[in-house]
Amino acid sequence: MELVDPNLDPWNHPGSQPTTPCTRCYCKWCCFHCYWCFTTKGLGISYGRKKRRQRPRTPQSSQIHQDFVPKQPISQARGNPTGPKESKKEVESKAKTDP
């Protein structure tokens, strides 16, 4: 094994840099191209700031298609509003006639 000059920084050692530049390709060969390609492409790790994709905004003129729903009147209670009272009367009258 060759001795490396101790005055050189580790990233400047011979063989530390690949001979070809990094590409945007995600094939197996390019994912193992160098340490950076392996971590970002192969493992999907990036420590940089993540950009949020914004949805394309609709122009103001497209508000026409959004019709407002008219206010509905408050619905009445379901069923017969005097239902329980009448049913009690019916039960009482049936009970009186069956002695």
Curated annotation (Swiss-Prot):
GO terms for molecular function: actinin binding; cyclin binding; metal ion binding; protein domain specific binding; protein serine/threonine phosphatase inhibitor activity; RNA-binding transcription regulator activity; trans-activation response element binding. InterPro entries: IV_Tat (IPR001831), Tat_dom_sf (IPR036963). Zn(2+) 2 binds at residues 25, 27, 30. The keyword Metal-binding applies. Asymmetrical arginine methylation by host PRMT6 seems to diminish the transactivation capacity of Tat and affects the interaction with host CCNT1. Residues 38-48 are annotated as: Core. The modification Asymmetric dimethylarginine is found at residues 52-53. Residues 1-48 are annotated as: Transactivation. It holds the Pfam family Tat. The modification N6-acetyllysine is found at residues 28, 50-51. Residues 1-24 are annotated as: Interaction with human CREBBP. Residues 49-86 are annotated as: Interaction with the host capping enzyme RNGTT. One of its GO terms (biological process) is DNA-templated transcription. Zn(2+) 1 binds at residues 22, 33-34, 37. HIV-1 lineages are divided in three main groups, M (for Major), O (for Outlier), and N (for New, or Non-M, Non-O). The vast majority of strains found worldwide belong to the group M. Group O seems to be endemic to and largely confined to Cameroon and neighboring countries in West Central Africa, where these viruses represent a small minority of HIV-1 strains. The group N is represented by a limited number of isolates from Cameroonian persons. The group M is further subdivided in 9 clades or subtypes (A to D, F to H, J and K). Transcriptional activator that increases RNA Pol II processivity, thereby increasing the level of full-length viral transcripts. Recognizes a hairpin structure at the 5'-LTR of the nascent viral mRNAs referred to as the transactivation responsive RNA element (TAR) and recruits the cyclin T1-CDK9 complex (P-TEFb complex) that will in turn hyperphosphorylate the RNA polymerase II to allow efficient elongation. The CDK9 component of P-TEFb and other Tat-activated kinases hyperphosphorylate the C-terminus of RNA Pol II that becomes stabilized and much more processive. Extracellular circulating Tat can be endocytosed by surrounding uninfected cells via the binding to several surface receptors such as CD26, CXCR4, heparan sulfate proteoglycans (HSPG) or LDLR. Neurons are rarely infected, but they internalize Tat via their LDLR. Through its interaction with nuclear HATs, Tat is potentially able to control the acetylation-dependent cellular gene expression. Modulates the expression of many cellular genes involved in cell survival, proliferation or in coding for cytokines or cytokine receptors. Tat plays a role in T-cell and neurons apoptosis. This is Protein Tat. It comes from Human immunodeficiency virus type 1 group M subtype F1 (isolate 93BR020) (HIV-1).
